[in-house]
C-alpha cells in the first residue's frame, strides 16, 4: 500500500460526530471522536511518518451560531486527542466564513496552506478523506470536489472502513 505524507481529513461526520444525532452540534460538548475511523486511517494508510491535516468549513462562526473561542478550544482538544491517539503530527485549517473564499471547500486554500506549511510539494503524496462525496443521502460532494480541484487522491470515510477500500480510492485526472 502506498504511504501518504499528508492525509487531509474533513472534520464533521468524518473525524467526529454529534452525540445528539443532530446534523449540527448543540454546542461544543455535543461531539464524539470516531475512533473506528482513526483506527482505519492508522492501519490502512500507514501513518508512521504522515501528518494528518484537518480541513473544515465552519460557517457557523461567521453567522454567530458558533462561538469562535469555544470552537478554537474544541479544535485544540480534537488535535491533541488525535495526536495522542495516533502518535502522529496533526494540524488544522478552519474556514470560518460562509462567503465565497479561496479557503472554503470545495476551493483548495486550506489544503494548499497546510501543504505549504509542511513543505509537501508533491500532490501524489496527499489523500483526502471526507463524508461529502455526492453519494445518495449525503448533503453534497464538496469534499470529493475539493480533492478533485487540488488534484489528489480521495476516499469517502465510509469506503475507508470497508474491506475492499483500496479499490475505492478515486485518483485525480491529470
Question: What are the language-model segments listed below?
Answer:
Residues 22-29, 62-72, 100-104, 134-141:
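Short, flexible/disordered intra-domain loops and linkers
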Residues 50, 120, 152:
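Short glycine/serine/threonine/alanine-rich loop segments
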Residues 38-75, 88-100, 129-132:
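Substrate-recognition element of Asp-dependent hydrolases with the DxDx(T/V) motif
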Residues 127-170, 174:
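Acidic, Mg2+-coordinating phosphoryl-transfer loop and its flanking beta/alpha structural elements
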Residues 38-43, 79, 111, 143-144:
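Short amphipathic alpha-helical segments and helix-helix/interface helices
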Residues 103-141:
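Conserved Lys-Pro-Asp/Glu-containing loop-to-beta segment of HAD-superfamily phosphomonoesterases
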Residues 62-85, 104-118:
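Short, electropositive alpha-helical surface patch
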Residues 1-53:
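Active-site neighborhood of HAD-like aspartate-dependent phosphohydrolases
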Amino acid at each position: 500500500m502506498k504511504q501518504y505524507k499528508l492525509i487531509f481529513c474533513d472534520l464533521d461526520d468524518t473525524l467526529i460526530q454529534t452525540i445528539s444525532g443532530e446534523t449540527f452540534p448543540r454546542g461544543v460538548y455535543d461531539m464524539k471522536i470516531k475512533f473506528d475511523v482513526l483506527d482505519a486511517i492508522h492501519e490502512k494508510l500507514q501513518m508512521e511518518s504522515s501528518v494528518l491535516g484537518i480541513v473544515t468549513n465552519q460557517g457557523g462562526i461567521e453567522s454567530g451560531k458558533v462561538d469562535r473561542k469555544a470552537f478554537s478550544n474544541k479544535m485544540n482538544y480534537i488535535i491533541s486527542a488525535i495526536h495522542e491517539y495516533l502518535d502522529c503530527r496533526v494540524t488544522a485549517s478552519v474556514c470560518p466564513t460562509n462567503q465565497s473564499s479561496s479557503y472554503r471547500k470545495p476551493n483548495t486554500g486550506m489544503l494548499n496552506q497546510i501543504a505549504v506549511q509542511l513543505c509537501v510539494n508533491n500532490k501524489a503524496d496527499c489523500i483526502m478523506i471526507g463524508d461529502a462525496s455526492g453519494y445518495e443521502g449525503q448533503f453534497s460532494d464538496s469534499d470529493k470536489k475539493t480533492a478533485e480541484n487540488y488534484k489528489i487522491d480521495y476516499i469517502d470515510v465510509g469506503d475507508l472502513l470497508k474491506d475492499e477500500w483500496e479499490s475505492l480510492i478515486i485518483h485525480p485526472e491529470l
